[in-house]
Swiss-Prot record:
Reported modifications of this chain: One or more lysine residues are methylated.
This protein's UniProt keywords: Methylation, Ribonucleoprotein, Ribosomal protein, RNA-binding, rRNA-binding
Family annotation (SUPFAM superfamilies): Ribosomal L11/L12e N-terminal domain, Ribosomal protein L11, C-terminal domain
GO annotations of cellular component type: cytosolic large ribosomal subunit
Pfam families linked to this entry: Ribosomal_L11, Ribosomal_L11_N
Name of the protein this chain belongs to: Large ribosomal subunit protein uL11
Subunit annotation: Part of the ribosomal stalk of the 50S ribosomal subunit. Interacts with L10 and the large rRNA to form the base of the stalk. L10 forms an elongated spine to which L12 dimers bind in a sequential fashion forming a multimeric L10(L12)X complex.
Parts forming coiled coils: none
């Protein structure tokens, strides 16, 4: 018989640096999960990724306090900022542009995120990433 699911916990944790401090510790502690066990497993799974990259993770907590977790791809905004060499997006994206990004780079990001996105095809996902880029104050070039 399958284990009974008690809760789902969604967090964004920096790759390779999960530790018991907030937000990880309090979120897992409330559900009675072994925090250090999660931190060690998460750090082991993300050790080959660029250190400090925010990784969304969905933790499934079972009624016996055991858990499983699934890591996802980094947020599109992080990938766009990295590709454009920015620290942050524009405070006023409609009037103040902060950089440019090539459409080919956006398509590459869409292909990276394809596993997590629910788009119909790669073109739809590319348009979605383009919208994110424009809302950050980036100009999309061909």
């Amino acid at each position: 018989m399958a284990k009974k699911i008690d809760a789902y916990i969604k967090l964004q944790v920096k790759s390779g640096s999960a530790n018991p401090s907030p937000p990880v510790g309090p979120a897992l502690g409330q559900k009675g999960v072994n925090i250090m066990e999660f931190c060690k497993a998460f750090n082991a799974r993300t050790e080959k990724m660029e250190k400090g990259m925010p990784i969304p993770v969905v933790i499934t907590v079972y009624s016996d306090r055991s858990f499983t977790f699934e890591t996802k791809t980094p947020p599109a905004s992080f990938l766009l900022k990295t590709a454009a060499g920015l620290k942050s997006g524009s405070p006023r994206p409609n009037t103040q542009k902060v950089g440019t990004i090539a459409r080919a780079k956006i398509q590459e990001i869409a292909e990276t995120k394809a596993a997590d996105m629910t788009g119909a095809d790669i073109e739809a996902m590319t348009r979605s990433i383009e919208g994110t880029a424009r809302s950050m104050g980036l100009v999309v070039e061909d």
